[in-house]
Amino acid sequence: FNTFINDGSTEAFNKGEFKETSFFGDPNSSFMVKYTFGEKMDGLFNTPDVIQQDNLGIAAYMKPAQMLTALRDVVLGKERFDAAFAEYIRRWAFKHPTPWDFFHTMENVSGEDLSWFWRAWVLNTWKLDQTVKAVAYVDEKPEKGVEITIENLEKMVMPVAVLVKESNGKEHKINLPVEIWQRGAEWRFNVPTTSEIKEVILDP
């Protein structure tokens, strides 16, 4: 938790007066992907003496902090995450909690089943790779809207934020919940566009 809390406290202290560039920088950078989701990365559930030396800093600090940031910003939202995190601290202060105690508290207070999240981030070394597979106009006419197909290429699943830009300047922001992946690796949805599509962006 140390890196995650440090990053948040630096941003919040004195209304951000001394805020520095986030520890994470650009979360989509090749550096983050290479070390957090690399082929040789160890699982977070391994004990430190089992984790490879080159991966220890990532497994102990960077990936857990990145995981908690994703849980707060993408999955639960700041309000629910902060309430659940505060309750975890209240329940387990001066005690000896296990990772399962943290998992259960976050789920209990937030009211969400997060088993899919822990399975991907903690219990396994799965990767996240989502893509736009197809874009097709309804009846082949741009003014009738568009059907977009997205695909999850790896085992990790996450909610999807989509930005659709039209040639006429209009933009559509769609937030799809993680449950869309329960029925398979592809999901189709329609957007009521009225002109040709300029761009479709995931996680804008």
Language-model segments: what does each one mean?
Residues F1-E151, V200:
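Hydrophobic alpha-helical and helix-loop surface patches within well-folded domains
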